[in-house]
A protein has these predicted regions:
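ABC ATPase NBD coupling module
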Residues: 25-26, 79-93, 101, 123-130, ...
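A short, flexible loop at the N-terminus of ABC-type nucleotide-binding domains that lies
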Residues: 7-11, 20-34, 84
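Conserved beta-strand-loop-alpha-helix hinge in the C-terminal portion
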Residues: 236-260
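The feature captures the beta-strand-to-loop junction immediately N-terminal to the Walker
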Residues: 48-50
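H-loop/switch region of ABC-family ATPase nucleotide-binding domains
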Residues: 216-217
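Conserved ABC transporter NBD signature motif
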Residues: 71-79, 239-241
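Helix-to-loop junction immediately C-terminal to a conserved catalytic motif
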Residues: 63
């Protein structure tokens, strides 16, 4: 028996994933350079890195926005390497930086939630709204503490950016995904709203133990949240910390690692 085996099953496996955009053209850019990453059930990994480090590209690869040039991606035991976004919808939920991208314009709060409840199946409103489901929606919205549970009939176009982002979060986890990816989902919000959405995120992720990958530029969030921290640079995983090593991190130590990565790049070039 392997006493060092992880007590939780592997949910996400990224192996040797590479991606180059505009290959052979003037704007050629290497987005991912042989990324290896494993997340177990309940892991909450925070991803940091400078602009162009590959953070959002990694999330896009996991979500299915493109097929990698090389490597493999497995989610909940299923090889999804070549599956497009809609074929991963039952496994991966995503919240974008732009609050407008996570909800369907022109529909009410309730109608958006009804669509989210059918994630991974046919997204239709037919027979989607009932008293029982309305109760589910109210219970899902109440913990946000911003009154959306009283605005089920409100068109989402009338919501503020923060309210819409909070709704996007609830929609993403209404049907628990295998993996939740958060791409700087608080970056476009004012500080007060960002704190509320982040608190709701942490509460929801912890309560359901959802395996989560969150990109942020907020160093304090990177230190305070999650059980793992990953730093990316030039499309690679430059540094990783978990457990006591993560708890010991400080903002100055992270800044120092950023500088070290840049210095290594300068030496290579």
């Amino acid at each position: 028996m392997n006493m060092l085996a992880h007590p939780e099953p592997v949910v996400l496996s990224v192996r040797g994933v590479e991606k180059t955009f505009n290959r052979g053209k003037a704007g050629e850019r290497r987005g991912l350079a042989g990324v290896d990453l494993t997340l177990h059930h309940g892991d909450f990994a925070i991803v940091i890195g400078s602009n162009g480090a590959g953070k959002s590209t990694l999330l896009s690869a996991i979500a299915g926005d493109f097929v990698p040039d090389a490597g493999a991606i497995t989610i909940a035991g299923k090889d999804v390497t070549t599956r497009p976004v809609h074929q991963r919808a039952a496994l991966v939920s995503r919240v974008f930086q732009d609050p407008m991208r996570g909800t369907a314009a022109g529909l009410t709060v309730e109608e958006n939630l009804a669509i989210a409840l059918r994630r991974g199946g046919r997204r239709s409103l037919t027979n989607a709204i009932s008293a029982r489901r309305r109760k589910i929606f109210v219970e899902a919205l109440e913990p946000l503490g911003i009154g959306l549970e009283k605005r089920l009939d409100t068109n989402v176009d009338l919501l503020s950016g923060g309210q819409r982002q909070a709704l996007s979060l609830v929609m993403a986890i209404l049907v628990e995904p295998a993996v939740l990816v958060l791409d700087e989902h608080c970056a476009a919000l004012d500080p007060r709203t960002a704190e509320a959405v982040m608190n709701a995120t942490i509460s929801a992720v912890r309560a359901a133990r959802i395996t989560t990958l969150m990109v942020t530029h907020n160093m304090q969030h990177a230190i305070d949240y999650g059980n793992r921290l990953i730093m990316m640079h030039e499309g690679r995983l430059e540094f990783e910390a978990g457990g006591e090593a993560k708890s010991a991190l400080t903002i100055p130590s992270l800044v120092s690692r950023f500088r070290s990565a840049d210095d290594k790049l300068l030496l290579v070039r």
